[in-house]
Design a protein with these regions (language model features):
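Active-site nucleophile and cofactor-binding loops and adjacent substrate-binding regions
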Residues: 15-17, 43-49, 132-140, 168-174, ...
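Well-ordered mid-protein domain cores that form the structural environment of catalytic cofactors
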Residues: 5-62
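Acidic, glycine-rich loop-and-beta core segments that form the ion-binding/anion-interacting portion
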Residues: 141-224
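A glycine- and small-aliphatic-rich helix-loop capping segment at beta-alpha/alpha-beta transitions
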Residues: 23-34, 59-69, 86-89, 185-191, ...
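Short internal beta-strands
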Residues: 69-75, 96-97, 192-199
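Short glycine/serine/threonine-rich phosphate/pyrophosphate-binding segments
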Residues: 45-58, 79-80, 174-181, 204
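Active-site/ligand-binding loops adjacent to catalytic centers
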Residues: 82-139, 144, 200-292
């Protein structure tokens, strides 16, 4: 059997892997505003299923010229995550519970970003919207780094030699972290397969297997709430890279919005499967494997 290694990404201040991006991203925003001569206040809107909320609040709290509002689904995060967000200190932070699931919160935030009337009203108040979710490219860029860091660590430890291909298995909900691995591969990192690991909300596993994405399905609340997502927004980026067609991807996203599903062409699915494989685990399997690994 091939050796298996675990990349520890819980050493940030909130114990979420997203700390690696969200500790850097606020500093990049401040520098970007300075370089562009921007003086307006920035309002960060965040939808979270758990991890992103606290990590974003911790990164952006008390950053001058910035305010942040986080929206999470009622009962859709772990109690620890809810308390982490609710107790966040800072004069510029706000947290709101949303009736619905993560997809409802994410869709609502996206609608605000696309509402020109809201943008005009905020402009009168000298406020500009931004995002700390992975729809913001600034979230994905720092995540590319630790794929290279992991590869370098394996070389340093003598486990591989430079040029050996390494597969990465990534727990996946919104397709952001695994997409960062795809970008690392495109940049030249010797990556074999990127394995998309899903829980019972296995919409991505079905898509990567069949080529049909169906968001209209039963939603499960699981013990991995950060992966309880049915509309994976970063998949749109992958589809663009594979098809190279704005119009085709726009058509797929229109179908998703109107019918809840879409199907890609066979050659598109084949191109995706060259880089990605997938699998999912039931709640029973998850609990059993945690017990096997840690007891």
């Amino acid at each position: 059997a091939l050796p298996i290694y675990a990349l520890e990404l819980w050493h940030g201040p909130t114990c979420a892997f997203k700390d690696y991006a969200l500790q850097l991203m606020p500093k990049l925003l401040v520098e970007a505003k300075k370089n562009l001569g921007r003086t307006e206040k920035t309002l960060i809107l965040v939808a979270t299923s758990g991890d992103t909320g606290k990590a974003a609040l911790d990164g952006y709290h008390d950053i001058p010229g910035v305010e942040i509002a986080v929206f999470y689904p009622t009962g859709g995060t772990s109690e620890i995550q809810r308390l982490q967000m609710a107790t966040q200190e800072g004069a510029n932070v706000a947290v709101y519970a949303v009736r619905g699931n993560y997809d409802d919160a994410q869709t609502g935030v996206k609608k605000v970003f696309g509402d020109t009337a809201i943008a005009a009203e905020l402009a009168k108040r000298n406020i500009r919207l931004s995002s700390a979710n992975s729809i913001n490219w600034g979230r994905l860029v720092p995540q590319i780094v630790y794929y290279f860091a992991a590869y370098a660590q394996l070389i340093k430890a003598g486990r591989i030699t430079f040029g050996d291909e390494v597969d990465f298995c990534v727990p996946t909900g919104n397709f952001g972290d695994i997409l960062a691995g795809y970008y690392a591969k495109r940049m030249g990192l010797p990556v074999g397969k990127l394995v998309c690991a899903s829980n019972e909300n296995n919409v991505l596993t079905d898509f990567l297997t069949t080529g049909t994405y169906t968001a209209k399905r039963e939603f499960f609340k699981t013990t991995s709430p950060s992966m309880d997502i049915l509309v994976s927004s970063n998949l749109e980026r992958l589809l663009y890279h594979v098809t190279g067609s704005d119009a085709e991807v726009a058509g797929l996203m229109k179908s998703l919005a109107e019918t809840g599903s879409y199907t890609v062409r066979p050659e598109t699915l084949a191109a995706i499967q060259e880089n990605f494989s997938c699998g999912w685990s039931s709640e029973e399997e998850v609990v059993g494997e945690i017990g096997r690994a840690h007891v």
